[in-house]
Amino acid sequence: MNLAKRRNSILSLPEYSLRSSESNKFTASDDELDNLRFGFFGEIGSLLSSVKRSIRDQVTESQSELASEELGDALWYLFGVARTLGIAPDSLGEACISTLRTRANEIAKLPAAPITFANIDGVLDSRHGQWDITRTQQLGSIANAAGMLAATAKEQLKAMALPAATTYLGRIFSEWALACSAFELRTEDVARENLAKIADRWPAKLSFHPLFDPESIYEEHERFPREFSIEFIERQSSNYPYVVQRLRQVNIGDRLTDNSNEPDGYRFHDIFHLAYVAYLGWSPVLRGLLKLKRKSNPVIDENQDGARAMIIEEGIATWIFNHAKDRDFYDGIKPGKLDFSLLKQIRSMVDGYEVGSCPLWQWELAILSGFEVFRELIRNKGGTVTVNMIDHTLKFIAPTDQRK
């Protein structure tokens, strides 16, 4: 994971608080404060676990790269706690800077509002190498601070006078900043990277990636139909069920079975390729099956529509299927709740391919919608699925009869 590059604009604490709050799903809940403070504790625990695994398993990512995401997630929860307690972002930043300057035996001089992450980095840089802490010591300090926050009764936190609560959270914020410094991370980079993750996973507004086969570039014979229907027909052989698929009354592809000793419905797995088309505008497998390869562009034809891309897509579909099989095929999982590590792994698998530019929330919609229709196909032993690439939908219609 590449660390976020610094921008020309400076990220202020009020801006971070506003943008990060857009993904807060705990708002107006009676347990909001508990969820946020326990979330902070959990992310610090994940930070410690990531560092431990990096040493034990000799992972290729550096400890700083691993720490950056965990510290970013912890920051999100910490600012959520501050908002819940009515602490303004600038006040939180001032308390953090005052704590750092006092610890460095400096005059607690405060910058003008709005407080920025660059202000905090400036304080850390002014004493670079002089904080007299090791990475291990600082992990212990922030773990202790997170534990104390989790152990303090919710009622006690809410009963604190605002100045006392601000000072208290400011101290925790300073421990977070020192943890960033211990991992040679700039707080502004960590905060920006966290905002990028939020936009990738939980955007305030959904805006789909443009289609990969626009009419302005490709002729009709090289474009997916913007709307089409595939009929899935389950039939029974002497030993096992199999599925055939039809497009406009014409069979396409080979008959599919579960290819497993234990029946699991894999015979309907082509629904996932349809979901990728509907929500991502991508499926090298279906391009090949429907003879829609973009041969007018030899580079695209070779690298994006070729055999390797097809193998990767089939590998993703199979890997996700195996992950879902142990989780009721994602029944009941809502958008925004799918395993984030799963989505990150998919991102790494499609790195270098056109679909790699699609945000993770699009992948999540494709996966969850695909499995929603998959469960209907299993339940109804087939059906018709309509793909709409403009509205980004999959629609299922149950079969009117049971074909044998």
Could you say what each language-model-derived stretch is?
Residues 1-404:
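Flexible "arm" and connector segments at domain edges
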